[in-house]
A protein has these predicted regions:
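Sec-dependent bacterial lipoprotein signal peptides
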Residues: 1-24
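Short loop/turn and low-complexity linker motifs enriched in small/turn-promoting residues
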Residues: 24-192
């Protein structure tokens, strides 16, 4: 009885893996901008084309984990409790929103989704992150940014990954945090 060599299968698998990972190096979710470059973002205009309108950008980042390309980004879904055109969550893998907003100067409440997708087609989102009554000044640029941490919870064999997201809103030019205002009792509100 003659045994078949597994070498051709290993070589083929290695070539396919290289092709898949190499071909996905430019991965980004839907048509959203993958790399942080605010000058290339076109803000969704809610200011009636005011020349001194504040602009709010939502963070976006691409990276690799274990060789798999990921795209994590924030997408604005509501301004002042009004759903933005085309925004929302249709399913766990289908989230839409705006990456930049042009607002009228003054106080506004924002709501957004933190979205994480990868080139393998898996991912998810945590929506209804919210900041209320934030003062946006004329002519200023802001960024809604995030930090996330992950942990594995559960008994062996029944583990699940838990993701914690912390968002801030900063003046993009001075780096001053404008929300939450620390020590004031304000918090970013995760809604359910």
């Amino acid at each position: 009885m003659r045994l078949l060599s597994t070498r051709p299968f290993k070589v083929t698998a290695a070539m396919m893996l290289t092709a898949v990972l190499g071909g996905c190096s430019g991965y980004h979710y839907k048509d959203y901008q993958g790399d942080w470059a605010p000058e290339q973002m076109t803000p969704y205009d809610l200011s009636n084309n005011a020349p001194d309108a504040p602009v709010v950008y939502f963070a976006t980042v691409r990276y690799r984990d274990l060789g798999i390309p990921f795209h994590r980004l924030l997408l604005a879904t509501h301004v002042d409790d009004q759903l933005l055109e085309g925004a929302g969550r249709a399913s766990i893998l289908d989230v839409s929103g705006k990456q930049a907003l042009k607002l009228t100067p003054g106080k506004h409440s924002l709501r957004w989704c933190w979205t994480s997708m990868n080139a393998l087609g898996t991912g998810g989102a945590q929506c209804n992150q919210e900041a209320r009554d934030v003062e946006f000044k004329a002519g200023k640029r802001y960024i809604v940014d995030f930090q996330n941490s992950t942990s594995i919870v559960g008994a062996p064999g029944r583990e699940s990954m838990r993701i914690h997201i912390k968002s801030t809103i900063r003046d993009l030019d001075s780096d001053e945090v404008v929300y939450p205002v620390f020590g004031s009792g304000q918090e970013l509100i995760p809604r359910t």
